[in-house]
């Protein structure tokens, strides 16, 4: 386990930390849900029709609740993921609601499991729910608890634009634009790069200069394919090319980043601060995109963002738009919030992206559920 430097600790004020020490974690409820996606998603990694969720509620001794959720790309693993959350909570039950301290405790307690994978996501669920509980207890939204002041977060649409026909992609892009969202991500992984160049060029021709495009290969290319395709995409003015190759091929990703004129984006499949540090030191990408669940929670996400800041790397979020908006509002090197509407029917406090931004409320905690 990577030791956290002092400058990456103490995410909140000493006054708030003192208040947290008097709040005791008492109970947890873990359930699952599989709401349908508003639009099925087809990527180079497969098709997604439902959002497989683990729903977590932690209650303090004084009855304050904190909520979080996890998204599982594979619904069959929901029982295992839910069980891991329950087991991990037993290790901190009865402790103070101090998310940073408790996350470090869990990482140390389970270090023989390697600190990655399902267990890391379990820690994340506890960490995020604990932060929500603390924010609600102190009457503060999380971005203010973390020292942020910006309430309008630049975002891009990621709710769809699956691999499909041009008419399907265009229809969805036009829907996004009708809501004022002209910044959007297109999934790639077509049989040939010629198809991809044609698709993107036609989108730009149809929609004009108003659109800003990112693309995502979802780890779908071989190294040779990635070099070939990134070169072919270089003249299209894309904001970034995301995860063209397997996420653990960080040395090859560094070579690709050096060769590509278009910025390379990765980070959603970095599962620890050690992996983040390695990627940053290698120069594996131009930008960083940690996933708040896979990295181990809000605590670890904010630490990763500080690490990126020292490398002068801009940070975007991956999924989880509700808590990610608070995270993005709290860092100085924020780039774009990934907005996906997958949970809009699950949580009454879900805030939609409009006009290329998500606007935070001043409600306490994360705000998954409106009071």
Model-derived features: positions:
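Hydrophobic faces of well-ordered beta-strands that scaffold small-molecule active sites
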Residues: 68, 155-159, 184-186, 213-217, ...
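Metal-dependent enolase-superfamily TIM-barrel catalytic cores that perform enediolate-based chemistry
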Residues: 144-145, 150-260
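Conserved, mostly hydrophobic/aromatic
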Residues: 56, 63, 126, 139, ...
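Flexible C-terminal active-site loop/helix
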Residues: 3-13, 23, 33-35, 48-53, ...
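Metal- or metallocofactor-binding catalytic centers and their adjacent structured scaffolds
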Residues: 22-27, 59-137
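Short Pro/Gly-enriched beta-strand edge/turn motifs at strand-loop
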Residues: 34-42
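Catalytic alpha/beta core domains of metabolic enzymes, predominantly
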Residues: 248-339
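N-terminal amphipathic alpha-helix/helix-capping segment at the start of soluble metabolic enzymes
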Residues: 14-23, 27, 31, 136, ...
